[in-house]
Amino acid sequence: MEIEKTNRMNALFEFYAALLTDKQMNYIELYYADDYSLAEIAEEFGVSRQAVYDNIKRTEKILEDYEMKLHMYSDYIVRSQIFDQILERYPKDDFLQEQIEILTSIDNRE
């Protein structure tokens, strides 16, 4: 499995998990976050390996569709880059640093 795809799916899952069904959440989390094989997930849920594969592929598409419409992950990346640039340019500005910490904590809320 490609590490870039795994990282992206894990990130998209963090942003959009609440929009998925329980089954979709379980399969994606086991497959990407916990590194279960399709066979292990199939055994765990008493379904075929093909059923797990199909569900994961559909859920990947759903996550990508959510990102295309909502841009939560890509916006988060841009905000993080801007915060880093501000902190680098104004390292001694305590007010800016405090405000960025507040904004970052809002972004990282669960």
Swiss-Prot record:
It comes from the Bacteria. Pfam families: UPF0122 (PF04297). Coiled coil: none annotated. InterPro entries: RNA_pol_sigma_r3/r4-like, UPF0122, UPF0122_fam_protein, WH-like_DNA-bd_sf. Belongs to the UPF0122 family. Might take part in the signal recognition particle (SRP) pathway. This is inferred from the conservation of its genetic proximity to ftsY/ffh. May be a regulatory protein. This is UPF0122 protein SP_1288.
